[in-house]
Regions:
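Transmembrane-helix boundary motif in ABC transporter permease subunits
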Residues: 9-43, 203-212
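Generic hydrophobic transmembrane alpha-helix motif, especially the helices
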Residues: 44-79
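Intracellular coupling helices
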Residues: 88-106, 113-121
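Transmembrane alpha-helices
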Residues: 112-148
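Interhelical loop and adjacent transmembrane-helix boundary motif
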Residues: 145-193
Length: 216
């Protein structure tokens, strides 16, 4: 349940932050302008930072403000972790948008907001792929949430309570001397594999559906 809460909330937040950044870089700015290239470089650097660094940094901030490990801390760290994945994946697709498509849209008197709607229809497969990659990275991450979300056997009922994720459950239960506990770890590992497989299938279906509307 903790994985569902953290991954679901961080994915929504990541999309809400990443999509405006991608459209700002590719529509409001020139694609190859200095500011656009600097923005891409910044997210490339963030993409290469290990998740444990995000977790350690967030943990330091939490200690400074006297905060405890919680569901909210896990959501924030995973959101920061997947935003570079969202931006890089969607930016690669957005840069391939035909310039003639946007020119034709503006020539018909469309506003930038209407041009963005047209662009969204074209890069929808990229958004689906970015979401798939981000969810896969988020649901399998253990290092970041180990510092921030904590671990508990109970279901969190508020953002201030600790939350257990599947990877952390597998990690702690595999080290148990009790066979029954280790069996639960194997079951959790199987469940995690099935979830990733289902997400992969859904992502491919969404990509195929929206690719029919893409202008080549």
């Amino acid at each position: 349940v903790g994985s569902v809460y953290i991954v679901g909330a961080s994915t929504v937040l990541g999309l809400c932050i990443s999509i405006p950044i991608v459209f700002f870089v590719n529509i409001y700015l020139k694609k190859d302008s200095k500011l656009a290239n600097l923005t891409r470089l910044s997210f490339d650097v963030l993409y290469g930072i290990p998740s444990i660094v995000y977790g350690a940094f967030a943990f330091t901030i939490m200690i400074f403000f006297g905060l405890r490990t919680s569901l909210l801390g896990g959501i924030i760290v995973i959101t920061l972790l997947i935003i570079p994945i969202f931006v890089r994946s969607m930016d690669e697709v957005a840069r391939q948008l035909p310039k003639e498509l946007l020119d034709a849209t503006y020539s018909l008197g469309a506003t930038r907001l209407e041009a963005i709607k047209v662009a969204i229809r074209q890069i929808a497969p990229g958004i689906a792929t970015a979401t798939l990659l981000s969810v896969g990275r988020a649901i399998g991450d253990a290092a970041g949430v180990m510092f921030t979300a904590g671990f508990t056997d109970s279901i969190p009922t508020s953002l201030n309570q600790p939350a257990a994720t599947l990877p952390l459950s597998i990690f702690f239960q595999l080290s148990s001397p009790t066979p029954e506990v280790r069996e639960r770890a194997y079951a959790a590992a199987l469940l995690l594999t099935i979830i990733v497989l289902i997400l992969s299938i859904i992502g491919r279906m969404i990509t195929y559906r929206f690719s029919k509307n893409k202008i080549k």
